[in-house]
Amino acid sequence: MATPHINAVPGAFAETMLFPGDPLRAKYIAETFLENVEQVTDVRNMLGFTGTYKGKRISVMGSGMGIPSASIYAYELIKEYGVKNLIRVGTCGAISTDVKVRDVIIAMGACTDSKVNRLRFKDHDFAAIADYSLLSAVVDSAKEHGTQIRVGNVFSADLFYTPDPQMFDVMEKMGVLGVEMEAAGLYGVAHELGAKALCVVTVSDHIRTGEKTTSDERQTTFNDMIIMTLDAAITL
């Protein structure tokens, strides 16, 4: 049955889904890496697709930008469509000087300035962590592909244009590897509903040094990350 934000029919989505922010990136993943692809939802142009990868049924759908948007789609996908494994794939900005542009970060945990998980957890701090089985599968796949990865915490920011750049100093002191905008909310929804979630992001730019990837570098690194993640997804 359709939800307010998804018009797919029951059974349209696979149990495992890649979850990029950009719906056009979802379209690119589906058309580039999947076979037998079908577009299954398009409400608000938030495109979702289902196909197969090496014979296994896989879905991919955009989440939009930020925790509120990602949380809505994750909730409806898990609650109404039975999605069990949600893997966010996207980009982030690096903070630590030992994290390099084009590195892949696997978010073991997600700090945040959002109150969304406190709302879920009676105003207490909730440890927003990834599912270990998903994390382990992607780490193993990265080793097989020879992909340079970092495993640790990210920071899920509510504001893209922060009014407090000194917060980056605190993040670096606490060992945060990168900044993005969705993981903490995704992890909270997954825990609330008994699903599994993981965030895998490539470093597209460095907040400290100002270094940025070119569009070609970004696409190549992104492709490598997607293949690595899809190869992990088919083992679940």
Curated annotation (Swiss-Prot):
Catalytic activity as recorded in UniProt: a purine D-ribonucleoside + phosphate = a purine nucleobase + alpha-D-ribose 1-phosphate; a purine 2'-deoxy-D-ribonucleoside + phosphate = a purine nucleobase + 2-deoxy-alpha-D-ribose 1-phosphate
Site (Important for catalytic activity): R218
Enzyme class: transferase
EC numbers on record: 2.4.2.1
GO molecular function, one term: purine-nucleoside phosphorylase activity
Catalytic residues as annotated in Swiss-Prot or TrEMBL: D205 (proton donor)
Gene3D superfamilies: Nucleoside phosphorylase domain (3.40.50.1580)
Keywords: Glycosyltransferase, Transferase
Binding of a purine D-ribonucleoside, residues: H5, E180, M181, E182, S204, D205
GO process terms (BP): purine nucleoside catabolic process
Binding residues for phosphate: G21, R25, R44, R88, V89, G90, T91
Pfam families the UniProt entry points to: PNP_UDP_1
Disulfide bonds: none
SUPFAM superfamilies in UniProt: Purine and uridine phosphorylases
GO annotation, cellular component aspect: cytosol
HAMAP family: Pur_nucleosid_phosp
Subunit record text: Homohexamer; trimer of homodimers.
Family: Belongs to the PNP/UDP phosphorylase family.
Entry function: Catalyzes the reversible phosphorolytic breakdown of the N-glycosidic bond in the beta-(deoxy)ribonucleoside molecules, with the formation of the corresponding free purine bases and pentose-1-phosphate.
UniProt name for this protein: Purine nucleoside phosphorylase DeoD-type
Organism field: Shewanella denitrificans (strain OS217 / ATCC BAA-1090 / DSM 15013)
